[in-house]
Every structure is written in C-alpha cells, then in structure tokens.
Amino acid sequence: MKFQLVTHFQPAGDQPQAIDSLVAGLNDNKRDQVLLGVTGSGKTFTMANVIARTNRPALIIAHNKTLAAQLYEEMKGFFPHNAVEYFISYYDYYQPEAYLPQTDTYIEKDSVINERIDMLRYSAVCSLLERRDTIVVASVSCIYGLGSPESYLSMTITLSTGDRIRINDFLNDLANLQYKRSDIRFERGYFRMRGDVIDIFPAYYEDKAWRLLLIGNEIEGISEINAITGNIIKCIDKITIFPNSYHITSRETLLRAVQPIREELNERLDYYYSQNKIVEAQRLEQRTNFDIEMMVATGTCKGIENYSRYLYGMEAGDAPPTLFEYLPEDVILFVDESHVTVPQIGAMYNGNESRKKKLIDHGFRLPSAFDNRPLKFKEWESMRPQTIYISATPGKYELARTNNLFVEQVIRPTGITDPICIVKPAEAQVYDVVHEAQVTIKRGFCVLITTLTKKMAEKLAEHMSELNMKVSYLHSDISALERIDIVYKLRSKEIDVLIGVNLLREGLDIPECGLVAILDADKEGFLRSETSLIQTIGRAARNAESRAILYADKVTGSMDRALKETERRRKKQKKYSVLHNVLPKTIIKPISNTLKEKVVVKVTTIGMNKDTVSSLRKQMLAHAKNLEFEEAAKIKNIIGRINNL
C-alpha cells in the first residue's frame, strides 16, 4: 500500500526546495543529510512529504516523550490511511535491578507498566512485520534490547476460515505464546473458551479481540469483536496471532539454551570458589538454577532477557536485537532535534554497564547478562539506515557527517518571522514577568516561562496561582501522558501559563503562545547556552504577535550569538515576505489529544491519601532517576502500606 499524504496545504516558504533536496539526496544514496529548520517552518510537514514522495517506511526518533507524542499526532493526521505507530518506554515507574555494595542491599527490578503504551509498542512491532506503509515515532528507548525478530516471527500462529485445528494443541500453542487462559478475566494477553467459541485478546489491540467459531475441529468463522461487549464488529478471513512477549523463543531453542547457561554457571562458580567468595557462589547457583527450572516449566522466568545471549544464539559482545532489527531495508531514519537526540543515544550504554557490573561481580547475574543492554553508539552508527538529522541548531556530529553541508528551512509558509527579542533587567524579573504574563493573557494568548531550577518553577507557579492566574509547571517527575495532558490544557485555555526548567525547549508546539520569558538568561551554562536560548526563543515563533523576553543584567557570549542568529533569520524572513507579498499569519492547528491518559482514581479511607501518595510517588521517581535505588525502594514500600489502609 502506498503512503497517502492527506492535507489541505501545499509546500510553501522554504519547504519546496527542502523537500526536493532531501528526496534527491535519498535517491543519490546519501547516507547522511541535515535539515536546518527553524521552529514553525513545518519540518514535520517536510518529513511527511519526503515519506510520501519516496514511498518508503520511516522511523522518527525524538529525544523525549512529549515531542514524540506531538510527532505521532501530526503524522497520524497526515497519514490516516497508513500505519502510524508510537514506540516509547512503557514504564510509568522503573527501578532496575541493582546492588549497592556499600550497604549490602539488593534491590529487585520493579516497574509500573503503562498498559496503553505497552499496547502501542506491540502494535508498532506488528505493523513493521505485517505491512510496508508504516511510520514509527519513537523515543531513544528504541535502542534497547527487544527480542529477536526471527524468534518472534517463528512463534506466530496464522489461522484462516476453514482451517482444521486440534483444539488442545492450539490452546497449548497460545500458552506457549505467553497468553493466559481465564474465563473471567478478559484483557490484553488473555484468551477464553466457551463451548465452541474461543476468544483471543491480542497484546496489540486496545479494545478489540478475535473470536473463533468452531464446528468440531474446523474453524467455521473468524470475527473481530468488541472486547468489552463481545459484539461482532466485522467478519474476517484470516488472522495472525503474534506472541504476548518480545523475549520469546521456541521450546526447542529454550531447552538448547539450558546447557550453555549451566556451563557458564559452572565456570563462574569455579571462579568464585577460587577467590573464596562463598556467598556470591551460593547466591548465583541458587538464582540461576531457579531461573532454569522456571524456563523449562513455563517457557519464561523473571528477568529472562538477561539470558538473551543463549536464547537468540548470540556471541559474547554481540549487539542486542532492538527495534532496528524489525525495520525494512529501505527505511528512512529521521532524527528529530538531533542536537539533543544524538548525544542521548551515545549516553545510554555507559549507565547500564556500570549497574550491571555490580550485579555480576556480586553473584546476582551471570556475566552474559552484560549482553542485555542498549546499543553502543558505534553499533547504532553501523546499523542505522539513510538518516536525515533535523534541528534548528544542528550539533557538531551531524554537521561533521555532511561536511558542514545542510538543507536550510528558515522561511515559514505562514510568513511569521522569528520573534522580537527584548532584554530586560533580571533584578525585578518576577514582578515584571507576572505583569507581562497578565498583559499577554488579556490579549487571548498563553505564556511559557522557563526558569533555571525546579524549585524556582514551583515557587513562581505558586505565586502566580495566589494571584488567581491559571498556571501549571512541567518537570521531569511528571509522566509522559501527564505532560501531554498539560500541554493540551494550555492550548485549550484550561491554563494560561506553563512554567518549566528544561522542558520548554525543543519541539513544544503551541501556536497560542504569545510570550516566551527566559528568567536568568545571563547565567551561562547548559540551560542558557546559545543552542538552548535559540531553541527556547523558537517556542514563540508560531504566533505572528508573539515576543521573547530575556531577563539579564548583562549580555553573555551565548546571549549575543543567539540574539544575532535570531536577527539574521528575521531579516531573511522579512525580505522574503516583502518580495512575495506574504502577510504573517498565526499557525492554526487542531487541538487533539488521542494519547490522553485514562485516569482511574482509587478512593481510600483517608482523605490525605491521594495527595500524600502523589507527593511520595514524585520522590520515588526522583530517587530512581538519580540511581538512588535504596531510597526509592523505601518510599515504594510506604506507598504500598498507605494504599492498603
């Protein structure tokens, strides 16, 4: 099936030449290209046109979940008849398995999985395996181990109307795919049998399931049903049932893996005993033997991914199978906001290796567990397909790959120029930013404010709230879907002011924004670097009446370069508008939120529980993020006790 771009717009501004240049580069087999596209110039629309023109599948990597969600929404709008999928980390809370030698504390892996995102991940994998017209929008989590596509595909079951099956064998096959049987509980990853009817709820459907109608051993009919009501949606001729776990393999392969696991265990035990490390030896022997027993009995075990070397026939040090293994050969890779995303990809491996080493050294895991990891940067480089890096401020790596050549997209189709930048003294910045925000809100626009610290963001939000202003703030403890919901509320005028630290830079797409305020702009550093300032100023470039205010008592080198680059772009944009008689027009973008989280509130007997648990959960997430696993585990236990009251 071809990619069908659905839009009322035609490429304009710099878009036509950018699309032509990028398509030509792909056709000329250029491995790397850079699109230097300013905020609001329609980079996503350019990507969509490149995909449609080349008719090639695509993987788009974003550096955070909020930006990935925006890209997913936009791509679904552009390609409603094709498979647009979403692949980010499915953890609302994640505490990896860890050992702290200082306190002799072992912390078991613990996580809270977001079921909706888990379903979307399965859907992405299945679309890549079943159809060519697929676009996957992913976060950097796509470089983490996922399971072998060969093993995954080999375990699929395809059924057609008229097929004859042995019912008991088929039910066993479903169990081998990690589907669970329950006549009462029917949700993703479950199946049930009632008389001559078998219902199967695939892992990659949210509210639909399949129904097999049997006459004897023959499949008389296959239906797609509403998973809640059981009502038939439509009749279908054929289905493919994919496994309910990525880390799955045939029973024969699994049994073959047992012997080399035992051999590695014996080698490691010999090492520990030679070093007189009796505790470590006993710990490893007990744990590994238990895992082997579970794998033989049930086909899986807790932490089975740590045995991936043997399950997938890998050699020591081989790159783990990831989402990249599932991609078609002619896929196009778009790295959005590449100046942030590329360094993120490079940083993932080191943190994982440090944690694993402690587990292995102290007898909690075999050395082969090292192979359950994210890709190293060099591995990612070697396997990535033709790549287009996209950023308003490309990094050194991207430009080095293209010999400093890039396709520039500075002219916006809307005629909007980069915003006027005003520098004001930082001394009275809080008083002034409140006043400027009130003026902007009266004009019918919303406000973005960026601070240097989370504490300052919270205090400013509290101060504005006391002045009866509708305000919220973004920070790293807020989940991906909650962030999306906050941005949705800002656009729909449920709130007027959004305050954040480092979350208001790349990719936040809010045409209703009439003011971007940067507090302490003269504090030189990562958050106030030239790149950060240009990106933050760019948040005001989707509205013809928007401004940017930088609060500073002096003009730093970063400020000077950012202001000069912004002015250079403004002059070029104004010249184009005059030459082509273009009047600046604010972007009109539908307000949608298809990823809005479905919130279920648990009523407890103590009125304070909701707020208390919310506060504790934020602390738990912060400790886990800072690798303070012992503290995170303590707080998790407290939350559990409160919820049981």
Curated annotation (Swiss-Prot):
User: DNA damage as a keyword?
Assistant: yes
Which residues hold ATP?
G37, V38, T39, G40, S41, G42, K43, T44
Q: Name one GO biological process term.
A: SOS response
Query: What residues does the UVR domain cover?
Result: 610-645
Chain ranges of the Helicase ATP-binding domain: 24-414
Picking any one GO molecular function of the record gives:
excinuclease ABC activity
The keyword S-adenosyl-L-methionine belongs to this UniProt entry's keyword annotation: no
User: What cellular-component terms does GO give this entry?
Assistant: cytoplasm; excinuclease repair complex
* Transmembrane regions listed in the UniProt entry: none
User: Where, subcellularly, is it found?
Assistant: Cytoplasm
Quote the SUPFAM superfamilies the UniProt record gives. Answer: C-terminal UvrC-binding domain of UvrB, P-loop containing nucleoside triphosphate hydrolases
Per its database record, what is this protein's job? The UvrABC repair system catalyzes the recognition and processing of DNA lesions. A damage recognition complex composed of 2 UvrA and 2 UvrB subunits scans DNA for abnormalities. Upon binding of the UvrA(2)B(2) complex to a putative damaged site, the DNA wraps around one UvrB monomer. DNA wrap is dependent on ATP binding by UvrB and probably causes local melting of the DNA helix, facilitating insertion of UvrB beta-hairpin between the DNA strands. Then UvrB probes one DNA strand for the presence of a lesion.
What HAMAP family would the database entry show? UvrB (MF_00204)
- PANTHER family found in the cross-reference section: UVRABC SYSTEM PROTEIN B
Q: How does it assemble?
A: Forms a heterotetramer with UvrA during the search for lesions. Interacts with UvrC in an incision complex.
* Record note on domains: The beta-hairpin motif is involved in DNA binding.
Q: Which family does it belong to?
A: Belongs to the UvrB family.
What protein is this chain from?
Answer: UvrABC system protein B
What broad taxonomic lineage does this protein's source fall under?
Bacteria, Pseudomonadati, Pseudomonadota, Alphaproteobacteria, Rickettsiales
